[in-house]
A protein has these predicted regions:
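His/acidic metal-ligating clusters that form di-metal
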Residues: 9-91
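Binuclear metal-dependent phosphoesterase catalytic core
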Residues: 82-130
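Flexible, glycine-rich phosphate/dinucleotide-binding loops
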Residues: 8, 45-46, 101, 129
Length: 130
């Protein structure tokens, strides 16, 4: 689980510190033969273009991702919006929030076989607030 350093940059912008990126690099090397899913607060590929919410200086993070081929997905929130994008073989999944309408959550299924790369399926489900 990664979270951007809010104490460095105030506001809604996220920032992944160098020691966090270094830790991620070591973990991805350690588990290089396994498919990895990263859970984090700030998305690298936002579901909506809002300059006020972007990750500050994501280049080092992308360098680490490009170096390792075992990351299959990154799941994040922050925008409170549903969205999915694919970049360089990594599925970037943004999840909605439960605190405001439309109240919903996301189910993520990952299917793996020895013959094929992992396949990821997502389903957005409404929350019954009655």
């Amino acid at each position: 689980m990664l979270d951007g350093a809010k104490e460095i940059i105030p506001g809604a912008i996220g920032y992944y510190k160098d020691n966090t990126i270094s830790w991620l690099d070591k973990q991805l090397t350690r588990y290089e033969k396994r498919p990895v899913i990263i859970l984090q607060h700030f998305p690298l590929l936002p579901p909506k273009e809002l300059n006020s919410h972007k990750v500050y200086q994501p280049e080092k993070y992308f360098e680490v991702l490009n170096k390792h081929k075992n990351v299959i997905a990154i799941v994040s929130g922050h925008y409170h919006l549903n969205g999915e994008k694919m970049q360089n073989g990594i599925y970037h999944i943004s999840t909605p929030a439960l605190l405001k309408p439309p109240y919903s959550y996301k189910i993520i299924d990952i299917v793996t076989t020895k013959e094929f790369s992992p396949m990821i399926y997502t389903e957005l489900r409404p929350v019954d607030v009655k």
